[in-house]
Amino acid sequence: MFKTRLLSGIVLVIIAFATIFLGGDVLFVTLLIISLIGVSELYKVVKIEKAPLGIVGYIGVVAYYFLIRAQKKEDLMMFAIILLILVMAVYVFAFPKYVSEQVMTAYFGVFYVAIMLSYIYQTRLLKDGLFLVGLVFLCSWGCDTCAYCVGVLIGKHKMAPKLSPKKSIEGGIGGLAGAALLGALYALAINKWGGASAGVGEYALICFVGGIISMIGDLAASAIKRNHEIKDYGKLIPGHGGILDRFDSVIFTAPVIYYLAVALM
């Protein structure tokens, strides 16, 4: 199991960084596909992945991505309103086929998965975006890895025993310290070998804050699974589960990195 998880994790990291490096349409299409799969995993939890209500959500994901591709940010509020009206229209005209939880999930899923993940693409468009996008994955997966290692070594006090019994406060602190250190080392590396002019302190701060948010994202995904008594969202990634199992922290971190980069850079 560990070997499978390690190998698939290495492949995932290689694919992620190759896609980020290429950027443009490759990154756009990849994120669109990942978002659609992630939304379908969430919809499967409430059994609407193949229902008309779910199809409205998928259409919403595609429409949203093409809005940001065309840089039509001024139309996003109108998009949110139209999507809400369409979801509620399916609800009332099919009543009582769907319960309110399914309806709210159909709408929520577009925001939780697609809109949050789209900030990876939007961050890539920023000045030094190639380097900044790396922070999304560095602070998410880096914090998780450091937290796991520290937790195994010295973890004693449970962070959220009802959600994730294996996570410890000591591991969380180690994860944040590790994320900040990785951010600083990353800045030094891209300055030396990538021709960047990244601020070491700024990158460390971004990764520290991103690490906090990544833990919230991880626990939020766990809470949904606990509520519905499921172990994983899917089986797409061997040893890891589904898209939401692997990208749960990235979903929360991506928009935070974007806005911190805009504010600090």
Can you name each region flagged by the protein language model?
Residues 208-216, 243-251:
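Hydrophobic transmembrane alpha-helical segments of multi-pass transport and channel proteins
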Residues 152-153, 223-229, 251, 255-256:
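Re-entrant/interfacial helical elements at transmembrane boundaries that shape
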Residues 226-249:
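Interfacial loop-to-transmembrane junctions
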Residues 141-152, 214-226:
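Short helical (or helix-break) motifs at transmembrane helix termini and adjacent helical loops
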Residues 179-180, 246, 253-254, 262:
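Hydrophobic transmembrane alpha-helices of multi-pass small-molecule transporters
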